[in-house]
Amino acid sequence: MAQEKMELDLELPPGSAAAPSDGGGLRRSNSAPLIHGLSDNSQVFQGSVLRTRRNSTTVMNRHSLFVPSSPIRIPSSRLHQIKQEEGMNLMNRETVHEREVQVAMQMSQSWEESLSLSNNDFEKSSSPKQVDFVPVSPAPSPTRGIGKQCFSPSLQSLVSSSGLPPSPSPSPTRRFSSRRSQSPINCIRPSVLGPIKRKGVTEMEDHPKRLFQGSTNMLSSEALHQPDLGGCLSAHTLDDNRSSAGSSCDSPAEAGASTGSPVSLSDSRSPFLPVDLTAKLPID
């Protein structure tokens, strides 16, 4: 019965309902395809006829898939791309300009700093208040070393280099200036002990010459007086021999001792050894 009803339902025209039989009617399903005849070569689904289901989302056709790539939207995307490129170009130009401005500012700041530093250096070099250094000679004197002692010929004692007495007469070549010296020659100061040493040396050299000259004068005067004294002694002894011959006290030695011989005179006047001049005198 069911198969017969199915066949009757298939033979009905499309859109028509089956006649009621046996107290009930059969209705075709809306989702089932229309089948006109059953055969082995017949296609169950026909591709030419497409029907959509009710109460369901609409299915887009193949033509609807190409809607995004419509010729209306292509120029809009191109315009957007052109605008974006122009914006990028503007951004690049702005960044390049900003970089150039920053480089120029940095260069100007560096120039200002260098000029300010050079001005500060010039002010430091020109102002005497900021120069507080002691000039040091390239070849320092051994008598002016730190912690050394110097022998002062004027004071006749050892004097430390830090406690040197100030010179009463200032040196004309030594200048007490606080300016920065431009040549190393100004840094070399003459030694304070130089003229004192030379003065002492000249005094020591001149003193023995004076002593020697004085001794030669004394010797020459004594040598000139000795022949006169010898002549007086010989005349005196001859007179004594004539007046009192054979006397024991008339010997030339005793007479020379009593009357004052030139030997005693030379002993009292000169520091040299006495010379016996009576041995050279002729004895009568």
Swiss-Prot record:
Residues 258-269 have a biased composition (Polar residues). GO terms for cellular component: cytoplasm; nucleus. One of its GO terms (biological process) is positive regulation of proteasomal ubiquitin-dependent protein catabolic process. The keyword Cytoplasm applies. Residues 1-32, 112-198, 235-284 are annotated as: Disordered. Residues 152-164, 172-184 have a biased composition (Low complexity). It is found in: Nucleus; Cytoplasm. Keywords: Cytoplasm, Nucleus, Protein phosphatase inhibitor. One of its GO terms (molecular function) is protein serine/threonine phosphatase inhibitor activity. InterPro entries: PBIR1/2/3. Belongs to the FAM122 family. Acts as an inhibitor of serine/threonine-protein phosphatase 2A (PP2A) activity. Potentiates ubiquitin-mediated proteasomal degradation of serine/threonine-protein phosphatase 2A catalytic subunit alpha (PPP2CA). Inhibits PP2A-mediated dephosphorylation of WEE1, promoting ubiquitin-mediated proteolysis of WEE1, thereby releasing G2/M checkpoint. This is P2R1A-PPP2R2A-interacting phosphatase regulator 1.
